[in-house]
Amino acid sequence: MSAIPLNRILPLGFLFHLLIFSFISLSSCMEFVEDPNNQGRISLQQRLGNQWAVGHLMGKKSLQDTDFEEMESFAKRNVENMRAALLQEQNRAESERELRHAQLVVRNILEQYLKNMQN
């Protein structure tokens, strides 16, 4: 019987599959290659337009339009508003504490009254 040994077939099969896969990958890559003549036109179109928020220029436009004197007065008004809100919150918390205390006193009075009524 003249059979071809397995150790001779495996390297040939590996080589065949390697060539097939490289050809398939090369053909699929060729579909996505752009025309070199269009590349200049595409990059030129990308440069047109507003670039104030691109890369290292991110946010620079908004900083240039700010008036620093206006920022200081805004900060003063903001601190005053925060102080007023804090005082209002403290007053509300104190009134809630007073309300809880009054409720506790009324509850104690009612409990004492009910105990006296049952006796």
UniProtKB/Swiss-Prot annotation:
Localized to the cutaneous granular glands in the skin and the brain. Residues 30-44, 62-119 form a propeptide. The modification Methionine amide is found at residue 58. GO terms for cellular component: extracellular region. It is found in: Secreted. Pfam families: Bombesin. Keywords: Amidation, Amphibian defense peptide, Cleavage on pair of basic residues, Secreted, Signal. It comes from the Eukaryota. The keyword Signal applies. GO terms for biological process: defense response; neuropeptide signaling pathway. InterPro entries: Bombesin. Stimulates smooth muscle contraction. Role in induction of hypothermia, stimulation of DNA replication and release of many gastrointestinal hormones. Belongs to the bombesin/neuromedin-B/ranatensin family. This is Bombesin. It comes from Bombina orientalis.
